[in-house]
Amino acid sequence: MRKHESLYLAFWVVRIREFRTKMNLSQEKLAEKLHVNTRNYQKLERGVHKPSAITIIPFLYLLSDQEIISFTRSFGQMVEKAHSQEVA
């Protein structure tokens, strides 16, 4: 997974911001739901900090089952595409 760490970080930044916007949540409110302080959430959203399992699990809990499937499939497809470009 280390090989795709930068891809994951970029993916996370886009997805968490999309989710926050879609749900009409402030950074403060989403930080509260993820059990992190606002400053750390802001760093997560900018890609300064990598999300930990302690952050990802509460985030997944906020998603519907279908959104979780979409989230994981999208990441898998992105990794597969990056891998196929490396091989080519």
What is each residue range found by the language model?
Residues 16, 27, 38, 53-56:
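Helix-turn-helix DNA-binding elements, focusing on the entry/boundary residues of the two helices
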Residues 23-42:
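Short alpha-helical DNA-recognition segment
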